[in-house]
Amino acid sequence: MTKPLVFAIPKGRILKEALPMLEAAGIIPEPAFLDKESRLLRFKTNRPDIEIIRVRAFDVATFVAHGAAQMGIVGSDVIEEFSYPELYAPVDLDIGHCRLSIAEPKRLAKDDDPREWSHVRVATKYPHLTHRHFEARGVQAECIKLNGAMEIAPALGLAGRIVDLVSSGRTLEENGLVEVEKIMPISARLIVNRAAFKMRAGDIAPLVENFRRLVGVADNVA
């Protein structure tokens, strides 16, 4: 008997927007998935051939890349940070929109010109993506990896600048920071394990097409 497909969903900002899309694609999680008090991480769906796991966004990419999950939804920031060759991202889901940006204290930004940077010390959850961005600009970057609370790093002298996701900019403003450069726009993507796609194309390709139709992409699955 073929094992159910495992579909990885991220906790946090994307989850709320992803749920209606999942349901529209014909995948409805069991009621326990919506229970905020539940500590379960693995859930059944209305389809016996599909299960859902709910994990941290960065872990979605890892589970899918290593084949523990065959499909998932995750932000393009995570895809770019890890650059797993095992991941195929066939559909931009047009949800979870924000941007990855560089921010610094307002007092510094008054007289600062990013075009003149030669060396920066940055606190970020995205060290690889950040290094690549600055390397392309010819700027030497010292990246300090944090998993959260980036906004407080400049005030405590840990780093002069931060690289983080920005939506409304309110969190930056409340912490005395200002956005000075946008690195890239971010949106959520459907991801698939490449090996699983080849081995279980009959199961996975129709799901990919369902998501394509939902966002109005008419191209056939490559």
Curated annotation (Swiss-Prot):
Main location: cytoplasm
GO biological process, any: L-histidine biosynthetic process
Entry EC no(s): 2.4.2.17
Catalytic activity: 1-(5-phospho-beta-D-ribosyl)-ATP + diphosphate = 5-phospho-alpha-D-ribose 1-diphosphate + ATP
GO molecular function: ATP binding; ATP phosphoribosyltransferase activity
Alphabetical keyword list: Amino-acid biosynthesis, ATP-binding, Cytoplasm, Glycosyltransferase, Histidine biosynthesis, Nucleotide-binding, Transferase
Protein's pathway: Amino-acid biosynthesis; L-histidine biosynthesis; L-histidine from 5-phospho-alpha-D-ribose 1-diphosphate: step 1/9
The UniProt record lists the keyword Isomerase: no
Domain of life of the native organism: Bacteria
Cellular location(s): Cytoplasm
GO CC field: cytoplasm
Recorded domain comment: Lacks the C-terminal regulatory region which is replaced by HisZ.
Quaternary structure, from the entry: Heteromultimer composed of HisG and HisZ subunits.
Task performed by this protein: Catalyzes the condensation of ATP and 5-phosphoribose 1-diphosphate to form N'-(5'-phosphoribosyl)-ATP (PR-ATP). Has a crucial role in the pathway because the rate of histidine biosynthesis seems to be controlled primarily by regulation of HisG enzymatic activity.
Family: Belongs to the ATP phosphoribosyltransferase family. Short subfamily.
Protein name as annotated: ATP phosphoribosyltransferase
Species annotation: Zymomonas mobilis subsp. mobilis (strain ATCC 31821 / ZM4 / CP4)
Gene: hisG
